[in-house]
A protein has these predicted regions:
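Core catalytic lobe of class I
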Residues: 1-186
Length: 186
């Protein structure tokens, strides 16, 4: 991995990274610079008040909101999301099972239509206080309502993605493996 330093409103590198607020129109417009994305893989906050199990106990901003605040946040997030993608964009949205109905409702209010639920099956479960330990994460595959989606896969793709989770979360408390993004692009 690479380490980068960013300050608010920085846009750096070939991968277009913005340190900003994905719910603010001006930040998203600065990031996209008039362009529209044909494919997006995103991992918005799950609103589960996550605290990492490492010594530094990493947390995630906007991950402990009230129901009303979270729905408002997700509505703003998906409204901005819709503005920066082409009508035929392929969309992948990681989300928490606990907020699935609200996430889907926010997507639909923004004109984003879920097509299928992908399940990322990890090689090990996540420790927590729940009765059942999560060994998977759901990912919506979606498109813009009323438009066909760009499809990057072949006809052998399926809805179960078995990929190892990163062995350490040094950059983000709930890191996703590069391999699941690669699968979305394949």
């Amino acid at each position: 991995g690479h380490e980068f330093e960013y300050t608010r409103n920085d846009v750096k590198g070939a991968h277009i990274v913005l340190c900003g607020d994905s719910t603010k129109k001006e930040d998203v417009q600065r990031l996209m610079n008039g362009q529209l994305a044909d494919m997006v893989f995103t991992d918005p906050p799950y609103n589960v008040a996550y605290v990492g199990g490492t010594d530094d106990e990493m947390t995630i901003k906007n991950d402990a909101m009230s129901e009303e605040q979270y729905i408002s946040f997700m509505d703003a997030f998906f409204a901005r999301y819709r503005e920066c993608v082409s009508d035929n964009a392929a969309l992948y949205i990681c989300h928490a099972s606990a907020w699935q109905m609200d996430t889907e409702a926010s997507m639909r209010r923004a004109g984003i239509e879920p097509r299928v639920q992908i399940v990322w099956v990890k090689n090990t479960f996540a420790w927590g206080f729940g009765r059942y330990k999560f060994r998977h994460e759901p990912i919506f595959y979606a498109h813009i309502k009323g438009h066909p989606d760009n499809w990057y896969g072949d006809n052998t793709q399926n809805t179960v993605w078995e990929e190892n989770k990163p062995s350490a979360n040094r950059l983000h408390p709930t890191m996703k493996p590069v391999e699941i993004v690669e699968r979305a692009l394949a």
